[in-house]
UniProtKB/Swiss-Prot annotation:
Known role: Required for calcium-mediated regulation of ciliary beat frequency in the airway.
Family: Belongs to the AGR family.
Motif, Prevents secretion from ER: chain positions: 161-164
Matches recorded under InterPro entries: AGR/TXD, Thioredoxin-like_sf
Name recorded for this polypeptide: Anterior gradient protein 3
Record localization: Endoplasmic reticulum; Cytoplasm
Keyword annotations from UniProtKB, A to Z: Cytoplasm, Endoplasmic reticulum, Signal
One Gene Ontology cellular component annotation held by this UniProt entry: endoplasmic reticulum
Residues making up the signal peptide according to the UniProt record: 1-19
CDD domains in UniProt: AGR
Amino acid sequence: MYFPMIELTLVLLASSNLAMSVRKEIRAPQTLSRGWGDDISWVQTYEEGLYNAKKRNKPLMVIHHLEDCQYCQALKKVFAESDEAQTLAQEQFIMLNLMHETTDKNLSPDGQYVPRIMFIDPTLTVRADITGRYSNRRYTYEPQDLPLLIENMNKAIHLLQTEL
C-alpha cells in the first residue's frame, strides 16, 4: 500500500513538472499595422478611414488580408520591406488593413477574396479603375506586382490632384 502511494506521487510530480516546462509560444503584441508597416499611421475602422480621407483630403488605401493566407503574407513582406511603398503610405494615404469584410459592397465589386487592395478618394468614391493585373481578381496583387502596386498608389495620388 505504501508503494502505490509513492508511485502516484511520482507520477503527479512528473506530470506537473512537465506541464510547467511546456511554455506557450510568446508572441509579439499585435499592432494596427499587423506587419504591413509599423511606421505607418493606421486607422482602426473603415468608417474612421473614410472620415479621415475626407477631412485630410487624402486617398484611403484599404488592404484586405488574412493572417493564415500565404499570398497575403508574401505580399505583406515585400510591402513592409519596400522603402518607396512605406514612404508613400506614410505621407500620402490614410491606411487601413482589414482581416474581415466591411458592409460596403463597393469594396468587393468582383468578389470577396484576399489579398485585395482598393483605393477610395476623399469624395468617398471607390476607385474601381485602379486595378491589379488580373482580370478575374482585379484588385489582387502578388509579391512580384509590387511595382504595379506602387504605380497604382501614385495613380491614386495623381488622380486626387487632377480630379479634385
